[in-house]
Amino acid sequence: MEKYINVIGGGLAGAEAAYQIAKRNIKVKLYEMKPTKFSPAHSNENLAEIVCSNSFKSNLHTNACGVLKEELRILDSLLIRIADETAVPAGQALAVDREKFSKRVTEELEKNSFIEIINKEIDEELLQKMIDNNETVIIATGPLTSDKLAKKISKITGNEKLYFYDAAAPIVSKESIDFNIAFYGNRYEQEKKKDESIEEWKKRIENQEKSYINLPMNKDEYEKFYNELVNAEVVELHNFEKREIFEGCMPIEIMAKRGKDTLRYGPLKPVGFDDPRYAKRP
């Protein structure tokens, strides 16, 4: 009887699992319900689709995120290798072109002779059949698990599913940004040094890697922005969503409602920047 491992879910975890198993000359059946069926969060047909932020966080070896990525490079992680190949400027972080990234992962897995990609939704009956046949199964469907499969997992584990309300990452067109006000700069690298003249500082920041675009605000502008944000129309919940917030991935409008200064001491803190128009912190 031919030996193989079933991997259910062709997202980030499932794609990496399939690659690592195949690398060890073990056959894989990789099940992905797209393009037959899409979850409300999915939009393209490729494997390893990035549905939230395109940032894999820091590349620096001075923090845990960077060290973990370097270890994954040493261990020949498919995802990190392709992330490096499809990287876009992001300062000291590793961010990717989400379309190129998922397309390249799909190409790598499709050409692997040890991997069979099956575009089919796994439901309760199919999973039970795998279990009855004593097949090895890796379930890597993550937070976008279909309802049919989620019910079966709940029965097997005896636990209700976990849940949190995720925030979508907005995409802003560069053409819509006024660069008479906005400026490029990485936090702490863009800031004027005490021993620099204005001319030396401006020359240095002009030659910096253009990774992040910053939009400075004065007090009146910030207060107007804050009021617009907390009173803005919000996306209506889908019938499968509940507004249960995870602190590590919080929608900005919910964070703002905790207080007017919350953003100023959080993601919008001006520390590490100087506005090139005035050579001082916004």
What are these regions (language model features)?
Residues 4, 27, 161:
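Residues at the starts of beta-strands that form the adenosine-phosphate
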Residues 60-64, 88-104, 141-148, 213-220:
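Short beta-strand to alpha-helix junction loop
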Residues 98-117:
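Helical element adjacent to the flavin cofactor pocket in flavoenzyme catalytic cores
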Residues 112-282:
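Predominantly flavin-linked oxidoreductase catalytic cores and closely associated redox partners
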Residues 61-65, 69, 77-92, 158-166, ...:
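A short alpha-helix-loop-beta-strand transition element characteristic
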Residues 19-81:
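N-terminal FAD cofactor-binding segment of flavoenzymes
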Residues 10, 33, 167:
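Cofactor-binding loop segments of dinucleotide-utilizing enzymes, especially the Rossmann-like FAD-
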Residues 2-13:
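Beta1/beta-strand and adjacent pyrophosphate-binding region of the FAD-binding site
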